[in-house]
Structures are given as structure tokens and as C-alpha cells.
UniProtKB/Swiss-Prot annotation:
Gene3D superfamilies per UniProt: P-loop containing nucleotide triphosphate hydrolases
GO MF assignments: GTP binding; metal ion binding
Annotated Pfam families: MMR_HSR1
Chain positions recorded as Mg(2+) binding sites: 37, 59
UniProt record similarity statement: Belongs to the TRAFAC class TrmE-Era-EngA-EngB-Septin-like GTPase superfamily. EngB GTPase family.
Cofactor: Mg(2+)
Ranges for domain EngB-type G: 22-195
Source species taxonomy: Bacteria, Bacillati, Bacillota, Bacilli, Lactobacillales
Record's protein name: Probable GTP-binding protein EngB
Residues in the signal sequence: none
Keywords: Cell cycle, Cell division, GTP-binding, Magnesium, Metal-binding, Nucleotide-binding, Septation
PROSITE patterns: G_ENGB
Organism of derivation: Pediococcus pentosaceus (strain ATCC 25745 / CCUG 21536 / LMG 10740 / 183-1w)
UniProt-listed InterPro entries: G_ENGB_dom (IPR030393), GTP-bd (IPR006073), GTP-bd_ribosome_bio_YsxC (IPR019987), P-loop_NTPase (IPR027417), Small_GTP-bd (IPR005225)
Amino acid sequence: MEVHNVELQISAVRPDQYPEQGYPEIALVGRSNVGKSSLTNTLINRKSYARTSSQPGKTQTLNFYRVEDQLFFVDVPGYGYAKVSQKEREKWGKMIEKYITSRKELKGVISLVDARHEPTDDDITMYQYLRYYDIPVLVVATKSDKIARGKWNQHESKIKKALDFDGSSAFQMFSAQTKMGKEEVWKWIEDRMGE
């Protein structure tokens, strides 16, 4: 998709704040600082539209980015950040669960993991949770440029094994630095939009 028009429509914490246009929605989930904002910026051809931060836990709302008046990217708060209080994590968890399990416009979830490391327990839990609810998932392994290309298959295999990856999901290595994987991610998104 050629992207020219993007707007942060709303940062929501409750269903009554969600957009009402009925556009397909693609949620981006992953632990704090895994690269959700960097992926979003790469997909929409912007350097810093979605705010990136070296401070984990920056996103605390569901951020609905309207793309070309055709779909929404929904940036979800990162999980697994220890400096956020347990109460705050529980609040985010309920907000995310309500969105994922009840939003009919949600057509798929891009679950980001760090390509350099095996998935965390939180990554595994999120992936299994999405599969349990039969939500289409694209696992995107970010920061792939930090790994020698000859080791990508090895890292992909470790990630898939840890997630107990199944054939109904898709997988893509990705780098915001080199834009590698951008077209494949867009293809997956466009396929979901047609469903």
C-alpha cells in the first residue's frame, strides 16, 4: 500500500472511545521496546510519526492510527516492563484483553519479538492467547539487521519452537533500519483487509 495520509485518530482506554468508521484494524503487540513504533513508522513511511522511546512502557493507551482512510494500526501498550506497577500492568491487561476479544474490526495481530533472543514467557503467552481466540497472527522478528544473515534460519527456528508456532500463523524477519520485510508485512496486512 502506498501511504501518504496517516493520522493518530485517538488514544483510547475504553471501548466507547474506539473509532466508529468500521475500517479493518491491525493491532501491534509485543514487549516494551521491541520495535512496535519503529515498525509502524516504517510501514507508513515516516521517521517518527509513531513515537519511539528508549524509555520502556511509554505507550499506555490503545493508539489508533488511521491509514489512508482504509484501516487502523492499533499500537498496544508493551508488556513485560518491570518498572510499571502491578496495578498498572493489570489495568493494561484488561484493556488489551477487552479490545482483542471483543473488537469485530480487528482483522489480525502483528506480534513482535526480538529476533536476537528467544521469545520471553510474555511473548509465548501472548502468542498462545491470540491463537486460542483464533485471531490471525503475523509474528514479526524485529532487529533482524543485528543478526548475521546466515543465522536467520537458526533464529527463526528457535523463535518458532519456543512459541509452539503453528501453520495457521505467518512469520517475517524485519528490520526498521534496512526496511527488510516491509513489503511482506504489508502483503499480510492487505490480505487481512480483504477478509
